[in-house]
């Protein structure tokens, strides 16, 4: 059984929601990524998304774009990320998902990327810019390696939700807003209606992401979903420029505060 399915099953049995955290692999550096992942797990993260740095991340706001750029400036490449995941797997069995842009996979080689992801212990992929029309090739390879393609839906894509979710696995990443990622004060979309719409088309667990920056927001949204995704607010804390141990402490206390309300 895929680690993602197993995790949602356990959480359901405990009556809890998933806390899914996002960081950019290689920011501030690749070795620190290893420490951050273990700190996230220790603080209560249930699933971790590792962003593969990309020069033109269309779905991301300024925080994650800057983070991606810092990693690229350090010369972080896909093989470095694969190696660090392999190292993480010696210590941890937490579900790990790559958030990766299609062009990165395409340039690396679809089959090569998926085989290596499988070999190091990646459980799923989120590909924000994957056109539905191009999905078939990746889906076939991903299925072959037991890697889940996690669908992304947005409030604007009502008629496309069925199409987007029908071959997805793991969970549905429900974008809570239209636009790019980034920590926000409030989330305007009528979440309840939106989640009901998504539920009409799929029984997969649903996780809400984009813009969740505080435990209060997470608490407000948890009743409508099976999980909460937090990225920019976490990446901001990593970028603050504390020394490493202070940064890890800050990350842990933020993640613990989110976990408490879920």
From Swiss-Prot:
This is Tryptophan synthase alpha chain. Pfam families: Trp_syntA (PF00290). It comes from Thermoanaerobacter sp. (strain X514). The keyword Repeat does not apply. One of its GO terms (cellular component) is cytosol. Belongs to the TrpA family. Pathway: Amino-acid biosynthesis; L-tryptophan biosynthesis; L-tryptophan from chorismate: step 5/5. Keywords: Amino-acid biosynthesis, Aromatic amino acid biosynthesis, Lyase, Tryptophan biosynthesis. Tetramer of two alpha and two beta chains. GO terms for molecular function: tryptophan synthase activity. PROSITE patterns: TRP_SYNTHASE_ALPHA. The active site is at residues 49, 60. Its EC number is 4.2.1.20. The keyword Hydrolase does not apply.
């Amino acid at each position: 059984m895929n680690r993602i399915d197993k995790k949602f099953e356990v959480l359901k049995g405990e009556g809890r929601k998933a806390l899914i955290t996002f960081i950019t692999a290689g920011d501030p550096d690749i070795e620190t990524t290893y420490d951050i992942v273990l700190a996230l797990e220790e603080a209560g993260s249930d699933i971790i998304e590792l962003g593969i740095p990309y020069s033109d991340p269309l779905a991301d706001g300024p925080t994650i774009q800057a983070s991606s750029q810092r990693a690229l400036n350090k010369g972080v490449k896909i093989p470095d990320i694969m190696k660090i995941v392999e190292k993480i797997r010696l210590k941890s069995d937490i579900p790990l998902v790559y958030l990766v842009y299609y062009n990165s996979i395409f340039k690396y080689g679809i089959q090569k990327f998926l085989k290596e992801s499988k070999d190091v212990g990646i459980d799923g992929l989120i590909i924000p810019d994957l056109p539905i029309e191009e999905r078939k090739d990746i889906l076939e390879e991903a299925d072959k390696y037991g890697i889940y393609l996690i669908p992304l839906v947005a409030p604007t894509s009502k008629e496309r939700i069925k199409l987007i979710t029908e071959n997805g696995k793991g969970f549905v990443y429900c974008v809570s807003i239209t636009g790019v990622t980034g920590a926000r004060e409030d989330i305007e979309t009528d979440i309840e209606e939106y989640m009901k719409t998504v539920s009409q088309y799929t029984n997969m667990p649903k996780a809400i992401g984009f813009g969740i920056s505080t435990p209060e927001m997470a608490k407000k949204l948890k009743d409508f979903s099976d999980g909460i995704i937090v990225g920019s607010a976490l990446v901001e804390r990593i970028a603050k420029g504390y020394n490493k141990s202070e940064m890890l402490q800050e990350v842990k206390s933020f993640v613990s505060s989110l976990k408490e309300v879920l």
